[in-house]
């Protein structure tokens, strides 16, 4: 369908995007083909792009949508590996539902989307805030396929997409400022948590941020 659209109008609108942008999409949506074309135009315009890709439950999709989703996801991952994007973040709707806990039909997508948006927002805040201390390293050029998740010092991490091979893990610890000032051995607790995730194949870094 997108091939019949007025591409000149699309190109004109995309020309207003400068420097960088983040694109959110799902391969099962009817607009995914148009989005792929838009990404090509943005790349030609020299725009740096991050992609957030929502993976649906393909088992319940129609055959047509299943094939479309797999094709779009494969194209995006190849684009990411080739450097067309800065990175692609994979997010599973099923994982979001599991983390959200109790959901209802009427508010289902709002409830699972809230899990993602609140987490993504805080990550953006932390990335643009100077940490109290950090061990952040420059990410490898090859690490372009990513995901995010939630974690705590007491529990296992809850990832938004299953990762078969973790090359780099980055923790952003948002901790109450008063707790940072008063809790004894907290830095050691954080360091031990990080060290427990390090392997020969996985490098781990972290930053600590005060919250109210």
Model-flagged regions — what are they?
Residues 1-212:
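Tubulin/FtsZ superfamily GTPase core signature
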């Amino acid at each position: 369908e997108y091939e019949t659209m007025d591409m000149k109008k699309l190109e004109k609108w995309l020309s207003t995007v400068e420097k960088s942008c983040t694109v959110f999409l799902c391969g099962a949506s009817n607009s995914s083909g148009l989005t792929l074309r838009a990404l090509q135009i943005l790349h030609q315009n020299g725009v740096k792009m991050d992609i957030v890709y929502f993976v649906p439950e393909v088992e319940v999709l129609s055959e047509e949508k299943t094939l479309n989703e797999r094709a779009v996801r494969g194209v995006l991952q190849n684009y990411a590996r080739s450097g067309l994007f800065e990175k692609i973040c994979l997010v599973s709707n099923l994982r979001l539902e599991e983390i959200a806990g109790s959901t209802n039909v009427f508010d289902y997508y709002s409830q699972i989307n809230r899990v993602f948006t609140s987490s993504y927002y805080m990550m953006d805040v932390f990335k643009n805030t100077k940490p109290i201390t950090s061990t952040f390293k420059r990410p490898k050029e090859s690490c372009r396929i990513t995901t995010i998740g939630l974690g705590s010092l007491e529990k296992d991490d809850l990832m938004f997409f299953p990762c078969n091979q973790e090359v780099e893990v980055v923790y952003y610890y948002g901790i109450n400022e008063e707790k940072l000032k008063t809790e004894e051995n907290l830095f050691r607790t954080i360091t031990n948590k990080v060290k427990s995730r390090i392997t020969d194949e996985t490098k781990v870094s972290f930053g600590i941020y005060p919250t109210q």
